[in-house]
Structures are given as structure tokens and as C-alpha cells.
Regions:
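Short, small/polar-rich loop/turn modules that mediate ligand/substrate recognition or access, typified
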Residues: 60, 65, 131-133
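A conserved structural motif in NAD(P)-dependent oxidoreductases
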Residues: 93-94, 105-116, 127
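A short, exposed helix-loop element centered on a Lys and neighboring polar residues
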Residues: 8-9, 53
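Short, flexible catalytic-loop segment of classical short-chain dehydrogenase/reductase
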Residues: 32, 71-85
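Conserved SDR Rossmann-fold cofactor-binding beta-strand/turn motif
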Residues: 65-75, 124, 137-139
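Catalytic loop of short-chain dehydrogenase/reductase
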Residues: 16, 22-48, 52-61, 73-74
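Short C-terminal tail/terminal secondary-structure segment
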Residues: 33, 121, 132-147
Length: 147
């Protein structure tokens, strides 16, 4: 939480002076649905989200937006290594773990990193100037809430 806040503080004034800036924090879907074994991470990510909520409303009048991307499971090296560990500890194959994880997600799959990148590119674009202080949950519909 501290490092992203310090980076924002170090760059936001220059963006305001130029009257253009886009800040995008990559946090986690755990901001909306905390993961029980990641207590400190849940708290730090939620703290950053709270910081952004206040600051984003002060900077948007200068064409500087600040938003958060909250990814769920994406098909990355990290996810594959986590699946391998989960398979080993549960006595299943990685393919079985993937199948079960896919079944648990309404989209029936993991996210494609390109999908994540495309959303990030849009949020950074000039066309996204009216979007600020938002948390974009990208999880294939896994989070069951409405807010």
C-alpha cells in the first residue's frame, strides 16, 4: 500500500500541471471478496482503494484520473504455479484442479491476460476521462455481489 501511494504522490502534481494523467493500480478481486489466508494483503489493497477514492475526486477536474483494476484468476505463470502446488497437496492432477476452478467460475475459464491489458489500455486512454475512482472487477463473474 505504501509504495503505490508514494508513487502516486510523486507523479500526480506533474500530471495536474500538464492537465492530463492516468493512474491505474492493479490490486485484486480480494478487495471485494477477501481471501481468508491473505489477511495483510487484503488490508493493504483495501487501504490503497480507500486512498484512491478520496484523491481521484480531487484530481479529475484537472483531467487526471485514478482507477483500480481488481483481477480474479488470469492464465498467468503465477496462477499455473499455484495450481501445480494445489494439485500436489490435494493429490490431484493440475488438469483436475483447472477443471474444478473453471467450473467454479461463471465464465467457465480463466481470464486471458490480453483482456486485462485491453481494459487497462482503455482506462488509460483520453476517452476514459470521465471515469475516476472506480474499481474494475475483472473476474469472469465470480464475485456474487452487486456493488
Amino acid at each position: 500500500m505504501i509504495t503505490p501511494i508514494l508513487l502516486i504522490k510523486a507523479t500526480v502534481d506533474g500530471m495536474i500541471a500538464r492537465r492530463f494523467g492516468r493512474i491505474v493500480n492493479i490490486t485484486s478481486s480480494a478487495v471485494k471478496h477477501p481471501i481468508d489466508i491473505l489477511g495483510l494483503s487484503n488490508g493493504a489493497r483495501t487501504g490503497l482503494t480507500g486512498f484512491v477514492a478520496g484523491l481521484a475526486r480531487k484530481t479529475v477536474g484537472h483531467n487526471v484520473t485514478i482507477n483500480n483494476l481488481l483481477p480474479g484468476p488470469f492464465d498467468t505463470d503465477r496462477l499455473r504455479s499455484t495450481i501445480a502446488i494445489q494439485a500436489k497437496t490435494s493429490g490431484r492432477t493440475p488438469e483436475e484442479v483447472v477443471r474444478d476452478r473453471h467450473k467454479a467460475n461463471p465464465a467457465g475459464r480463466f481470464g486471458d491476460p490480453a483482456e486485462f491489458g485491453e481494459l487497462c489500455a482503455f482506462v488509460c486512454s483520453a476517452q476514459a476521462g470521465y471515469i475516476t475512482g472506480q474499481n474494475f472487477l475483472i473476474d469472469g463473474g465470480a464475485y456474487p455481489g452487486t456493488l
